[in-house]
């Protein structure tokens, strides 16, 4: 079924330019996934390597989660489902946002192949706005600060990018409140 979905995604006319360049949709799923990370679209480097979070952002995310690279990539217990499966391109102020149809059309069908998901980490505003009952005007800071309101299934996070160092410095509660709660939840799920 997962292979069929991948072929459907590649055959979607809206993805034709990516498929024509030999690019496959980028996500990391398995029927055994217990913790799913839903984040932004892959960047240009990920488009070339096909490996999600294989950078400083990934190092920080794994640190926040309290897990190592082997658990992240090889255990079959961690999945990653971006808000777009392809790099959407560069804009005037950074990467373009994920294309809106991707999550609406494909996420639930892919989620249905992972029946054991207990925790979904929503990394960044696009994922949070899609999955949480929040107002479009609510800031990422406010949503992440209210992380306990969305449990136990969802846990909103800031993006772990080094570009967010200023945000992290301005919001020390993230490291003192959110990260320990995240690490405990992840550890509890993984030891089952």
What are these regions (language model features)?
Residues 1-144, 148-189:
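A polyanion-binding, active-site-adjacent surface
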């Amino acid at each position: 079924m997962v292979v069929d979905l991948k072929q459907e995604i590649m055959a979607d006319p809206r993805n034709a330019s990516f498929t024509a360049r030999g690019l496959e949709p980028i996500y990391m799923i398995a029927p055994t996934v217990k913790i799913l990370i839903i984040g932004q679209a892959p960047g240009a480097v990920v488009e070339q390597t096909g490996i999600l979070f294989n950078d400083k952002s990934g190092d920080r995310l794994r640190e926040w989660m309290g897990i190592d690279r082997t658990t992240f990539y090889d255990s079959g217990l961690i999945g990653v489902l971006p808000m777009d499966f392809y790099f959407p391109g560069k804009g005037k102020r950074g990467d373009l946002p994920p294309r809106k149809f991707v999550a609406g059309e494909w996420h639930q069908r892919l989620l249905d192949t992972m029946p054991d998901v207990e925790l979904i980490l929503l990394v960044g505003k696009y994922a949070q706005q899609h999955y949480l009952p929040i107002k479009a005007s609510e800031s990422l800071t406010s949503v992440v600060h209210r992380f306990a309101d969305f449990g136990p299934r969802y846990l909103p996070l800031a993006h772990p990018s080094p570009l967010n160092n200023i945000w992290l410095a301005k919001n020390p509660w993230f490291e003192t409140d959110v990260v320990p709660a995240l690490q405990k939840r992840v550890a509890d799920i993984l030891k089952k």
